[in-house]
């Protein structure tokens, strides 16, 4: 990509290099150093790039990493800070936003560094105080956050995912740990699988285990209602969000904001209660129909456990060209919670959907009770036809995604749109 300057431009791609342009050298493209020089480009690093783009180094960057909860936690911090009167930027799975305005569409969880610097340039122009970003394990291994100075770092949790990229769970865990070796402010989930971290400037949070930010009592009956203690402070979290996993997300979001800006606790409580959640995360898209992005065994278990008081009809699949070992585990978990399970297609990419579906099916013990419907629209239609008054249809895997990737082509597809179309046709 190119970023324009007054009389030149910055690029991270040697194919775009010209005489007198600037080539941003990163860990990923360093091997093309000689090619950039041959074309007459000036080699710069991230710090030099920030100066050329006149990025305000006073902007406080908050990074969130973990298997699940990154998107909701990032959105919660963004919303709370905006409600407290601060100017903020946000980038992650849902796209990029500055001061409540979307400036870029959905992309990678963590963008290439030059794209992130472009967002920070806009954040500077819009006089932002904070910039919140999701940080994936891929980005940590590929050093896509090099040169960024984080004011705060958050660890949500770690469970099996991305073994197609990391090879082993230990490699995946080590990738997450890379983020927490320095002395910056950090927030660590004490109830999650333990990771190594630098204890300097570390704040812990938890429900089950002793932590600096501790939940003392909570109710999840209608939304979330809880009391949080921290040293000599006590404040409430009251939220319409559902589930224990969202309690953790709101706990760390409030802890992070509390440490960074020291707000009046009544203002903090009001800002927390004003956060309505994220599209595609336990989102009720029609009466008795929930759509959620959960696509890992742990994520699926947390969502279904939250909804277990209802009779569940679960529509789900698994993405192609990704960790295959999690597929039977996903099936096993859905079987435990679902009245009816419908296995379908979910971004099969280069793989055959039927193969993925069979691998999910292998996790079921009572296979005769499972419906296999490859066409995702037909699978959703079947679930809605089978739904009785007290049932809850739960459609997992895509959340608010608007495409379905098959053989390298992204076709328009939205679970939410499909549900509403089917219900409209049913009258």
UniProtKB/Swiss-Prot annotation:
Q: What EC number(s) would the UniProt record show?
A: 6.3.2.13
Q: Under what name is this protein listed?
A: UDP-N-acetylmuramoyl-L-alanyl-D-glutamate--2,6-diaminopimelate ligase
Q: Which NCBIfam families match?
A: murE (TIGR01085), PRK00139.1-4 (NF001126)
User: What positions does the entry give for UDP-N-acetyl-alpha-D-muramoyl-L-alanyl-D-glutamate binding?
Assistant: 14, 109-110, 136, 142, 144
Query: Which GO MF term does the entry hold, naming one?
Result: tetrahydrofolylpolyglutamate synthase activity
Quote the function comment for this protein. Answer: Catalyzes the addition of meso-diaminopimelic acid to the nucleotide precursor UDP-N-acetylmuramoyl-L-alanyl-D-glutamate (UMAG) in the biosynthesis of bacterial cell-wall peptidoglycan.
Q: Where does ATP bind?
A: 66-72
**Source organism of the structure:** Campylobacter jejuni subsp. jejuni serotype O:2 (strain ATCC 700819 / NCTC 11168)
Cited HAMAP family: MurE
